[in-house]
Amino acid sequence: WTNLQWIEWGINNGIDHGVLGAAKDNPQWFHSFRDVPNPEDNPHIFHPKEYRKGFVTPRSLETASDMAKVRHLMDDQTFTASLIGSIGMRTAMDLATHLKLADQLPTLDSIKTDPKNAIVPTSAAAKCMIVFRTLAVIEKEWINNWMDYLVRLDRVSYARRN
């Protein structure tokens, strides 16, 4: 599955809209280990060269969606723990943050097509999430649009401190 194929399936099968949004922004969740020679390059997926207690698959992401639908019944710690058990630590942390900050985040499509008007979040966590999310999936075709968007964030969001 690609992320877009899974999203199409998910729309028709009642997947939580926040999980669909995270899947759209994280195509690397759907990559095959066959396309990733070095397991460190994609810590979200199964890779036979590295033992991982958990990892994301289309099926486990459906389970995460079921949990996301009832997250209002859990505290943050319980919700995150349930995600870790189904999709692995790294993906669970990314998804939990995405769900918490989703209304502040611009879509990748809005950055690619209209970087000067894409939403700029107010929270530092959301700004950092945008930077790291984008760096994981950026392609040369839209790097100029990313740079147009990036200058709209305050320097603290992307500057490295020594």
Q: What kind of region is each of these model predictions?
A:
Residues 1-162:
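C-terminal regulatory/interaction module of P-loop NTP-utilizing enzymes
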